[in-house]
Structure formats: C-alpha cells, structure tokens
Amino acid sequence: MSLKNGEQNDLSPKDSVKGNDQYRSPSGIHVEHEEESRNDFWQFESSNLFRHPRIHLEPQEKSDNNLKKFVIKKLEKSCQCSSTKAKNTIFGFLPVLQWLPKYDLKKNILGDMMSGLIVGILLVPQSIAYSLLAGQEPIYGLYTSFFASLIYFILGTSRHISVGIFGILCLMIGEVVDRELYIAGYDTVHAASNESSLVNQMSNQTCDRSCYAITVGSTVTFVAGVYQVAMGFFQVGFVSVYLSDALLGGFVTGASFTILTSQVKYLLGLSLPRSGGVGSLITTWIHIFRNIHKTNICDLITSLLCLLVLLPTKELNERFKSKLKAPIPVELFVVVAATLASHFGKLSEKYGTSIAGHIPTGFMPPKAPDWNLIPRVAVDAIAIAIIGFAITVSLSEMFAKKHGYTVKANQEMYAIGFCNIIPSFFHSFTTSAALAKTLVKESTGCQTQVSGVMTALVLLLVLLVIAPLFFSLQKSVLGVITIVNLRGALCKFKDLPQMWRISRMDTVIWFVTMLSSALISTEIGLLTGVCFSMFCVILRTQKPKASLLGLVEDSEVFESMSAYKNLQAKSGIKIFRFVAPLYYVNKEYFKSVLYKKTLNPVLVKAAQRKAAKKKIKRETVTLSGIQDEVSVQLSYDPLEFHTIVIDCSAIQFLDTAGIHTLKEVRRDYEAIGIQVLLAQCNPSVRDSLARGEYCKKDEENLLFYSVYEAMTFAEDSQNQKERYVPNGPSFSSD
C-alpha cells in the first residue's frame, strides 16, 4: 500500500500478525485512518509553525430576507403621500417639466431647429413610403411620425434619439394587417379606391378595407404600448438583455430581406397578394417570377432612375458627413421631381402606374381600438413591443453615454409605450427609435428634445397644407425609398469577417437569426434567435475552459499553465481553475476534467483495493508455511501530490448539484489521502456552501481567501504531517 510519507516499509511476520485484523476489515482501516488524518489536519492548522497566518474576515450582518416584511415595507413606502413625493412623481413621469425651464435658448435653439427641420424633411417621404410597408394609406404614416415626435418630447429622457416610423416594425404590423384583412374577407390584391376609402372615413360612413386596415394597425399598436408601459411599471426591462447585438443585427438584416422582397412588386408595377406566414419571402419571389411578364415598363424605368439618383447621393452623404453641415435631402427632391413628372406627364392615365392617390388634409376624429380584435393580435404585439423598446432603450443609452448624460431606462419604456398608446386613438401605428434618423439628428446639431417639436411642426405643415400635392406620386418611388434605406442593414455582411475573428459564437447567432427571420418569418426568427442565443450561453458553460495553474516567479499570482510559459508548479500540490458557474449542466464535465488533469480517485481507490486483496492473500500463505521468519513488503507507488486547490474565482454561483459535486469530489480524494481546498470563493458561493453544509463547524478552514494562502497552508500542513507520522506504516486506503 501507498504510505503517506512516500516511503516503503518492510514488515516482519511478527509485525504482520499484528496487522492481520486490519486486513480482515479494510473498511475499518479507512475510517480509522480518515478520522486520524482529519484530527491531525486541524491540529496542524491550529499550530504556530505555519509560515503565513490565515486570513480571517468578519462577514457583514445580513439583511432580513423575509418576503412578507419586504412587501409590506415596499407598500408602505409607495402609499406614503406628501407634497414633495407628489411633485417628484409628476416631474419623474414628465421629464419635460425638469429640463425645459432650464433650457438655454441662445446655446441650443439653433442646433435644435436645424436638426428638427432636416429630420422632418426626411420623415415626410419615409413616412409615406413606410405606410405601404405597414399596409396603410400614406396619411397614417404622417400621423404616426407627428404624434410620436410630440409625445416623446414630453416623456422622453434622451436628447438625441429620433422616435417615429421604423421599417422593421412596419413590416411586422403589415403582416398582422394582411392576415386580419384576409380573415375578414377583404381583397388582398386590389384595394378600393384611395379617394373613396378616405372620404368614407372622414364622413364616418361604413368601414371599408382601408378603414379596417388602420383599425387592425391601431389595435396592435395599442396592445404593444400597453405591454411596454407594463414592462416599465413592473421594471422588467431586463428582458432586453436577452437581445444581444448579434441577435438584433441578424434579426434586422433578415427582416430587411423581407422588406426588400415586399417592395419589389411596387418597383415592377405588379399587383400581387402580400404573402404572410411561414416562408413568405420565398412565396413572394415565386409570385414575382410567375408574373414578371406583367411588369409595368413605366414603373420599372421610374424605379431605375430613382435608384440611380438615390444610391450615389446617399453614399456621398455618408462619406462626406463630416464636411457637410447637413445631409442632402435627396429623398425629398426625388419625391417632388417624381410627383411633378407623374402629374404633368399623366403617367397614371397613360401607362396605368400605381399612385399614392388622395391624401386628405387635417386630422380624422379620434377612434378607439377595436376591443374585439385584441385577443387575436395580443400574441403578435409581444414581439413588436419587445423589439420596439429594446431598440429605443439601446439607442438612448448609446447616445447618452457618447454625450455624457444619463437616461432612465424605465422612463424610456414609459415614453415609447405612450408613443404607441395615445396615437393608437388617432389612426396611427407602432413607432420606435430609428438609428439612421438619430444619426442625422445628432450630426446636424441636435442639443435637446426641442428638436422633436420642430420635426412635428414640419409634419404638421405637410398634414394641413402640402399632403394633397402628393396625389400623383408613384408607389414605385416610395418602394425605392424604402429599399435604399435598407442599405445599412444589408451592408452588415461586410462586418462578418471581423465578427468571426472576435467571436465565432456571435457570428453563428447572427446567421441563425438572420436566416430564420428571412426564410421563416420575422416573429419566428426573433424567437429562434432568442432561443438559440440562450442555448449558446448554456453551451458555453456546459464545457467551459479549465486548467491547472502555476505560480508566476517572485509573486503570489497564479495563471494557467496551458496559456503561459515559465510558470512554477508546486511539488505535491495541484491548483485547478474552472471558468464557469458550477451547476447541473456542467457538473459531470467538472468532475471529468478535474480527474483528467489530476488523477481519478475512484480508479486509484479500486486499484488499491485490488492490490490489498492480493497482498493479504500472499501474506496468509507465507505465514502458514514452514519458514519461521519471512520479510513481506507491502507497498504502493506513492501519489504525486497530496493536495488539490480549486480556484473558485471564476465560479459565479453554485446550485444544489454543484454543491453535491464538490462534496463528492472532496470525499473521493480524501479516501486516497488527498485533501481538497477551495480558494477565492465569492460571498455568494460561500453562502451556498454554508447552506449546503459543505463544511462542518470545525472545517471552515477548508475555504481560503486566496490561492497563495491555500498553497502555503497545504505546504505547511504537509511538512508538519511528516513530522508527526509514526514509524509504522500508514496506509492511504483500505
């Protein structure tokens, strides 16, 4: 058998006879030896011969975690009423009351007016174009952008983001609208006359296709807004953390392919049903190629001319944005030129091109959402609400950090929620912040939320005076504007090589989300991306990195021996680091990698038992022979080490399975005479170990505050054990 001091001893027959009882009860040896070893361990620990004193920290008194008391305390605090609290509540809910009285007119007004004017000019054609994407009439896009700009001015905390119409949300709204129109029995190919549709609504007559479409859109918007306000109220904004940058990037790119596909029919002048549901992108392209011979040549030529103007000018704006005081509003110029050409050339009458039609001036009477539709659209609104607030909060925090101020994420959720709830009563659909317009707003001198008021005034001018002038505007022009604005999302492919070098896992998440969003559907794509992203997190912790550590020369620092050279491995001590939480998913991997890098105590124990049986049998035969005195040598090869130190600095938490695994590992190693020490456990892990009874009251010294302390303790205790070891053999197992 292996001796604790690594030596071999010869036993005479006389000595062997004394030990026969122990051999007949191997388990008795183990219990007796383990108890003796443990007593020696604590005796050594309490002696004064250690080179370094142990670190002892006094824990803070823990707060009372009684749920009932916590809830009562919160309710008492919430129900207290005073003039100061009422004032703070009002000012917190309406941030405009805080910052507007302090507004520096001379310093900020010029930049706010300039940025608001330019964003308003850009929003006019985009609002009209994105209305088609949402399955609505052009006027509703203008309503949406107008109300969102005003409400965010009152409730928002970000000085720079532009809240209004957003392509991805318009696509998601449009899919719901088309589905409900189909269920209601409306023709999904040919809409009723634009003029008659809107006249009926203005005069409160029977609701036709256009009326029902905006009813569905407003209802979805209302429900999404309620979700967002509820998220703010219950402070569940943490949901957005599951939408990583890679996931959002893949989702936006995948949805952009769907948007592009939905606009191709306008570029070609085709009257096609809008495909929805699973595989809509493929279905739409099949319909396009089947009807390609019906292409309207006038619409095709108009689309190509607009592309030739818009794409180069957009690139110039991007390349020379640092030199331009304001971006060239090329979209507005294209819309004006195309409208004039269509009107005076009578393109609709001569060539049958599809035009925007009558856009009324003024505002329609408020109308409540259709409460009967809410159960049918409630699930659709969840994804819309999450995407809307995730993009808004992330953009507001990004620009706040860039310009050195803070935003309140909860208030941002309230703001975007009410930007959807209130306008839903005024024939509007879902809004959120948009990166492209926010960048324009920032680059043109925006200083505060006053910029949003200027944007709203531009849109109000269009709504009251200019809107009817867009009657002859071709829908192909609006389709081109929508597609050109997707170039940022579609150009993300050029960033993939760099993303692959930085994180292959993020790149895979991006591709999975992009492909599922494009080829299946936007909602399923988002859900697939979230599920796959969470699976990747679990996968990363299922088989994390684990390594043996060595000591950096002339220091108390330990690092991975597989990552760095010239590290010193301490004789007789193995230091093991596991870089992940230890829980039910990776508990088996933890044991397997620890056993692989040190030794498997179960196999060693089995080998010792087998060897013990063979030597007992041999001894019995020898003693019963004719010889009076025979020397029998019982020995094992000594183990390479006596202590394992587990560096727990990277273990964020333990669950029940993790605690049980540590107990099992410790028990298995102690059975062969190897002590297990834990080092650098954070307070959470220490609490878990205490609750799981990993250490008994007299075993708290198994936990160390640093790896160096644990290593020193192991060396000193082993040195003292060798002094106390008796002359006779000391077996490490039964």
Swiss-Prot record:
One of its GO terms (molecular function) is solute:inorganic anion antiporter activity. One of its GO terms (cellular component) is apical plasma membrane. Keywords: Cell membrane, Glycoprotein, Membrane, Phosphoprotein, Transmembrane, Transmembrane helix, Transport. It is found in: Cell membrane; Apical cell membrane. InterPro entries: S04_transporter_CS, SLC26A/SulP_dom, SLC26A/SulP_fam, STAS_dom, STAS_dom_sf. The chain crosses the membrane at residues 113-133, 138-158, 222-242, 247-267, 269-289, 292-312, 379-399, 415-435, 453-473, 519-539. This is Sulfate transporter. It comes from Ovis aries (Sheep). The lineage of its organism: Eukaryota, Metazoa, Chordata, Craniata, Vertebrata. The gene is SLC26A2.
